[in-house]
Amino acid sequence: IRRPPRSTLDRSSAASDVYKRQMLENRETMLQMFPELFTKNRVQPIQNYPQELLYSLKNTLPDTAENKSNVCLLTPGPYNSAYFEHAFLADQMGIELVQGNDLKVVDGFLAMRTTQGHQKVDVVYKRLDDEFLDPLNFNEKSGLGVPGLFDVYRKGRVTIANAPGTGIADDKAMYSFMPEIVEFYSGESPLLQNVPTWRCAIKDQLNYVLDNIHKLVIKQVHGSGGYGMMIGPTATKKDIANFRRKLIATPQDYIAQPTLSLSTVPIFTNKGFAPRHV
């Protein structure tokens, strides 16, 4: 969130459920504290988000689905930092929260272990990275996924959301092409504008970034969660020199963007209210 409305990145593979829970709880708190604000400004409700998400998931049922469809949320487990949010969202949607060892391929279909035996699963809402999804097809050391799951998926017998491979749009270099992609496929200009982005793989743009590195935010194209980036105006001389070497050695691994004035929200600290960036 920032002013004016622009996007700084796309998360299309497994965006954190932490933000979804915070969104719902924040709205509930705000409704209790400032009900007139929402009534006066006709703010759209979001409390039905979990059910809307479930509705969307059920709309992706495979052709093999029967009248009584089964949707589950696949979590890495209780040691994952977002496990509480996974449990919260599964509970709100009224679906089963499962780990990899709760699922099994039976007779060419994905099944969930229950007290009544195996039950066929039609849709898996995955909350783990693709590489851990199936040790037979991806990372063989993964103990979080389901052996053979991807084979069932390729045969069209189960839906995985978001689909494996959609994480390509998380790539920050891909982000810089999004306006052109939107126009190519829709014939329309995007409603939400991108932040200006320099692709360091292009020599002229790399030269600009190197000349202005102290003013820009440098991001690793495959990085996430604040890793692999440098904020020029607050960086030390050592950090700037380090990133300059990285840009020269592997320019294709980086993009650059201007620093932004992010939106803030008031929070309560031990010294009273203070603004914090969203």
Give residue spans per PLM region:
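Single conserved hydrophobic/aromatic residue that forms the stacking wall/gate
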Residues: I1-A15, Y19
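Domain-scale recognition of functional cores that engage charged ligands
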Residues: D17-V278
